[in-house]
Amino acid sequence: MSDEAVAAAWAREDLEALSERGLRRYLEPLDSPQGPVVRVGGETLVNFSSNDYLGLAASPTVRAAALAAVERYGVGTGASRLVVGDTAAHHRLETRLAAFERAEAVRLFNSGYAANTGIIPALVGSEDAVFSDALNHASLVDGCRLSRARVCVYPHADVEALTRALAETPARRKLVVTDTVFSMDGDVAPLRDIVAACRAHGAALMVDEAHATGVLGARGAGLCDELGLESEVDLRMGTLSKALGVMGAYVATSREVADLLVSRARPFVFSTALPAHLCAAAEAAVDAVEGDPDLRERLWRNIRRFADGLRGLGVRAEPRSAVFPLILGEPERALDAARRLREAGVLVKAIRPPTVPEGTSRLRFCLSASHTVGHVDLALEALRSVGVRRG
């Protein structure tokens, strides 16, 4: 039997097991641009599954910036930034993001996953300890594992438990990592208290602002911006692929850390550089976030309307972000609810393990500035008519 046949047999066995548990995934391509209404599988549906929180993915201004950069730089970079893949567009975006984040420096990565799995191992190793919230994104979890540091997982948002762990864990270096907005639950980290705990125990702090960038803060720069904690957090990872509508990620930090990542962050060193046209598009998106506060206000009007509607249906809803989970329990229940909502014209995907813990499969609604009042009300009416209730 060939190696290919052996691997295929393994895959068939695993796929059957996933199917039996309701955990097999399938791809479903869109036939339209990303937006509040999409074409998928021959249907036109109102989209509540996208992280395009400000509707910038199809923005004419952002698209025009990308097209102009394609004319100048072409579509690919050909190498890592350390070889010949670096362009003026990369440096302009890093400078623009540093100003946006009020940071000394910014370093770009190809994705949030690449950033988190590169940054953490670049800073800590086998003599060190990393303290990670139990509900952190998988990229932070994997970054911790790859670092070979001792990993201390503290209960979700439990600063007392974090403080005890910091006090009781001997290590050369201590690094705390947390999401600011938790992607599957939509809640917000108790960041002021985490900063205080880090300060008291000499720990560095890294936050993942992926679902806060463009959504929270007076300037749209995330939870650190909202709380005025930019100077208190050592590393702030942000994404270009959610509210900014493009692709890629970055870390806002000190000049020294940004310089170290050029030599130490393996996804940065060993990946072909982000295409220059995406850098240009992201720069235009940052300009839109800072220059058009009405974008965020439209988003927050939709968030408040949806939260009010959920409460009217008897569902507890706290409008702290653009993410609203409806936890239903077992995968089959979430899949069935997603199917019935789709029949009502609403696209919201079922989120199942391992993305979320066992027994907490859910529908995850994501609001966007590009949703109309009619879109929001359609989703609420669909929930009411199909009788979806929290498990």
UniProtKB/Swiss-Prot annotation:
Catalytic activity: 6-carboxyhexanoyl-[ACP] + L-alanine + H(+) = (8S)-8-amino-7-oxononanoate + holo-[ACP] + CO2
GO MF, one example: pyridoxal phosphate binding
Pathway named in the protein's UniProt entry: Cofactor biosynthesis; biotin biosynthesis
Binding residues annotated for substrate, in chain numbering: 25, 137, 355
Residue positions where N6-(pyridoxal phosphate)lysine is found in the record: 242
InterPro entries assigned to the protein according to its UniProt record, in alphabetical order: Aminotrans_II_pyridoxalP_BS (IPR001917), Aminotransferase_I/II_large (IPR004839), AON_synthase_class-II (IPR050087), AONS_Archaea/Proteobacteria (IPR004723), AONS_Proteobacteria (IPR022834), PyrdxlP-dep_Trfase (IPR015424), PyrdxlP-dep_Trfase_major (IPR015421), PyrdxlP-dep_Trfase_small (IPR015422)
Domain of life, source organism: Bacteria
PROSITE patterns found in the cross-reference section: AA_TRANSFER_CLASS_2
Cofactor(s) for this UniProt protein: pyridoxal 5'-phosphate
EC number: 2.3.1.47
Any single biological process term in GO: biotin biosynthetic process
Pfam families linked to this entry: Aminotran_1_2
Keywords, sorted A to Z: Biotin biosynthesis, Pyridoxal phosphate, Transferase
Binding positions (pyridoxal 5'-phosphate): 112-113, 183, 211, 239
Family named by the database record: Belongs to the class-II pyridoxal-phosphate-dependent aminotransferase family. BioF subfamily.
NCBIfam families: bioF
Subunit (UniProt): Homodimer.
Record protein name field: 8-amino-7-oxononanoate synthase
Higher taxonomy: Bacteria, Pseudomonadati, Myxococcota, Myxococcia, Myxococcales
